[in-house]
């Protein structure tokens, strides 16, 4: 392999120029998530419809009903939980994690008086009637963020979104008569079926749309205005809460101004980050379109992205309350930021989590009795309030450790030591203090007496938890190693407790067929959460140079493959592709990504939780649940095909099949902050270092 070093970063625009144009066939009427997506990190727009009707579904990434939630209680101590688990007391655990309804609820005339949680709200829809014209197709240029709708008679409607102006624009050609209507969520059946019983009033209409006064949260507005231009009309759409009025002089902006903003924004985005070129058009689209969606929903000036980003349904509550799900889903949503080089996109998430520290510190005190810890439940709203109902998930401390690992990974990639000093290091130490408080001495080693392997056994106390879950062990080791590295980076001496945990806590729980989920629980059926293999990826804590360990890994992998995909959900498929690449099976990695595209995308390229098409998984009953974790994880998986780091060494093109005769990447980020270009042509590999980090570079092979 030839390695060449360049003195300065080179911005290679050829790859940007060839970015994928994604196409749609209309009608797209199954659900809004079949539509063409636009977002600015705050507002999301989905363009869908059929016949003579265009629907613009609008959502906001901060639109929460904050009432409710399940604060940690003194009864929910780790000691009490262990005692109930040992007695197999399912009723006791259910009672411990159920609470009375607080007084700020006050529904009227409904049975909604039981336990409840915060949830994200639908906003509304703008519809356009086309005066007899018919929608035929649509497309989106991922290089510029510009889209268009093509009518059956060949005329085109242009689409663009401006982050700078917080404005979506739709240019209608001269001679096409359109009628607009702005429909609030309260005009849909969800209002009379649910929202009115939860204390919501109907939205109040105004000249351009409506304003919706919420029970305890800030009001929200959706507006749409048609403005005549020389060559047609432009419809402008915006949302607003307490921001300044968006672009009051819309008539002077013109569609051209919005389109220019979009071109500039996406040019800068693509030049900042990684680009790839592969001969497989489906994999190329997964990367280009997925990275576009990642950049849209995680903008550095936007709101932290939850399961659906800002693309929320307009006529129903979003699945799982639209929560921040920290046992893998948020991590997958943000995973393209690292190898992709979009480090600033992580900051809204990190600022939000660090702002929760008083709550998380109180959780730790009640959970394990320490004052210097942090406990982040796996499901929370944007204030860090626990969204309850799943006790085994709530006590999953790997959620906290994984977020701490994300923070330090950002430091490694970006070199941002100030962030480490100002909050990340404290969060990492607090997470480790809780893990150590959970551990006990057992046969001369450290052991975690009770913990979950995520989503295994649901909430069945006889199945869902056990001693030394391999997932928890891997998360703890990742955190320890990150803490030691962080201390050295800051010129501090590593805590002896961390070193003791690294030495005496097992790396995984072993069984006859490889890694077990936890003690006494082998991997016996297909499952969506590959958590027992997390020591391979994402945590990279398994020493593959140890021959005995390598044999355990081989057995684990074979058992996992044998159990198959029958109970997989969409978000776990790209993770599986990375695991295939990790063990050196590139054809399996790529075919797994192609399977995700084939089975877990709807006809409008929407990333689904359940399989849309049959034959790959029996988890296929809910074909309209969109989540962004799968799409973002697919982007990350494509980059891991190009460069994959294992045990401190980076291997280039490890996940690329030999049938790919020409494959390349540009501006890819490594864990020390180095940026690299690479190409493989007929088996010959060339690597260029085009940017340099401040850490120790990984070994290259």
Question: Residues of each region from the PLM?
Answer:
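Catalytic cores of secreted or luminal carbohydrate-active enzymes
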Residues: 102-131, 625-671, 675
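A conserved hydrophobic secondary-structure block that centers on an alpha-helix together
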Residues: 152-167, 186, 404-434
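Active-site core of glycosidic bond-cleaving carbohydrate-active enzymes
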Residues: 53, 67, 73-75, 326-362, ...
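Acidic/polar, glycine-enriched structural segments that form the non-catalytic walls/loops
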Residues: 18-323, 342-347, 353-362, 491, ...
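Short, well-ordered beta-strand segments enriched in hydrophobic/aromatic residues
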Residues: 167-174, 476, 676-679, 685-692
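Secretory-pathway/luminal and periplasmic proteins that interact with or process carbohydrate-rich
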Residues: 105, 294-303, 319-321, 345, ...
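The feature captures the catalytic groove of carbohydrate-active enzymes
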Residues: 309-323, 371-422, 436-499
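Sec-dependent N-terminal signal peptides
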Residues: 3-14
